[in-house]
Amino acid sequence: MILMKDIVRDGDPVLRQVAKPLTFPLSDHYKQLAEDMMEYLVNSQDPKIAEKHQLRAGVGLAAPQVGEGVQMAALLVPDDKGEIIFKEVYVNPEIVSESVRQACLSEGEGCLSVDKVINGYVPRPDKLTIHYYTVDGEEKTIRLKDYPAIVSSHEIDHLNGHLFYDRINKKEPFALKEDTVVIS
């Protein structure tokens, strides 16, 4: 079971490196890693389990965040009522197209690897098309918009050595392009 002590924190070099692609079939180690990352997200969104194990709630977790420099990320995205609207483990994901129009979360973003609050809007594409493989090696291409697209972009950034605050406008953290969609 992944706990907060297992989450790599900002400053660790693995978070700033481009993760390596995985080859198929995945080894048992990487299959277990995918399971463990998803289990963390499920547990972190359950108030009783999260409190018992002192887990910070998360909607996404990338392999570099647990010290594994490989192209894998787990996503468990709820809607505003707590119902899961997107659940997947990406292996070797690639954003193949993105909208010109941007979106951001009204409250900004956070990250399990970043302990401090960093205020500001994090502009990301409003819509994404992502090509990836499942843990079983099935090739998929999906189109996402709004919150699932933002979470996917955040996690894929981790696989490319970027953190959310890299996208915040340093001079004007709450400045946005005119047609940016702000998601509450």
From Swiss-Prot:
InterPro entries, sorted: Peptide_deformylase, Peptide_deformylase_sf
Top-rank lineage group of the source organism: Bacteria
GO BP, sorted A to Z: co-translational protein modification; translation
Keywords assigned: Hydrolase, Iron, Metal-binding, Protein biosynthesis
CDD domains recorded: Pep_deformylase
Pfam family membership, one: Pep_deformylase
A GO molecular-function annotation: metal ion binding
Binding site for Fe cation: 111, 154, 158
Catalytic residues (UniProt): 155
Protein EC: 3.5.1.88
Swiss-Prot/TrEMBL cofactor(s): Fe(2+)
Details of cofactor binding: Binds 1 Fe(2+) ion.
Chain ranges passing through the membrane: none
Catalyzed reactions: N-terminal N-formyl-L-methionyl-[peptide] + H2O = N-terminal L-methionyl-[peptide] + formate
Free-text function comment from the UniProt entry: Removes the formyl group from the N-terminal Met of newly synthesized proteins. Requires at least a dipeptide for an efficient rate of reaction. N-terminal L-methionine is a prerequisite for activity but the enzyme has broad specificity at other positions.
Cross-referenced NCBIfam families: pept_deformyl
Family: Belongs to the polypeptide deformylase family.
PANTHER family, alphabetized: PEPTIDE DEFORMYLASE (PTHR10458), PEPTIDE DEFORMYLASE 2 (PTHR10458:SF8)
Protein name, entry field: Peptide deformylase
Organism of this sequence: Lactobacillus helveticus (strain DPC 4571)
Higher taxonomy: Bacteria, Bacillati, Bacillota, Bacilli, Lactobacillales
Name of the gene encoding the protein in the UniProt record: def
